[in-house]
Each structure stands twice: as C-alpha cells, then as structure tokens.
Amino acid sequence: MKLYYHYDQEADVLYFSQGKPSAKDQSEEAKNDTILRIDPKTGKVNGFTILNFARRLQRGMTSVSLPIEAHLTQGL
C-alpha cells in the first residue's frame, strides 16, 4: 500500500495516509494537535493529521510522538 502525505502551508497542517484517504474514515483527536483517521470497519489507523506543523519546527521540535503503533511492510 502506498503512503501519501500533503502539507497545506496556508493552514500549517501535515496530512499523512496509508493508501488514499477515505471519506468513510472516522477522526479521533489524539494529543499534541494530532488527529487520527480510523477505518470504522477494522478500527485500524489509516492516517493522521498534525496541526501547527511548521510552528513546531520553528520552536525547535524536531520530532513528533504519535500515539499509534505502526507495522510497515514493503510490497513487491
């Protein structure tokens, strides 16, 4: 499955998805201005949104801790 990301500079938001985002996904607010996108059928996290992304970098934050566990595999 492909990984997609998009940064909206005007809104200062980073969007990250495993596969194409779906309108059926449910959003759940996590901590630190992070929103998780969850598949309602499987309960698995399909992506996340990080608010105030550039501001974090300007404040010297070089990493963002996400409240999810990821298992990535390489497709052939």
Question: What residue ranges belong to the model's regions?
Answer:
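A short acidic/small-residue loop/turn micro-motif
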Residues: 22, 52-55
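A short, polar/charged loop-to-alpha-helix boundary motif
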Residues: 55-66
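Short loop/turn microsegments at loop-to-beta-strand junctions
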Residues: 2, 32-35
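N-terminal intrinsically disordered, cationic/polar leader segments
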Residues: 16-21
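Short, acidic, Ser/Thr-enriched surface-loop or helix-capping motifs
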Residues: 8-9, 39-40
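Short loop/turn motifs at secondary-structure junctions and domain boundaries
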Residues: 26-30
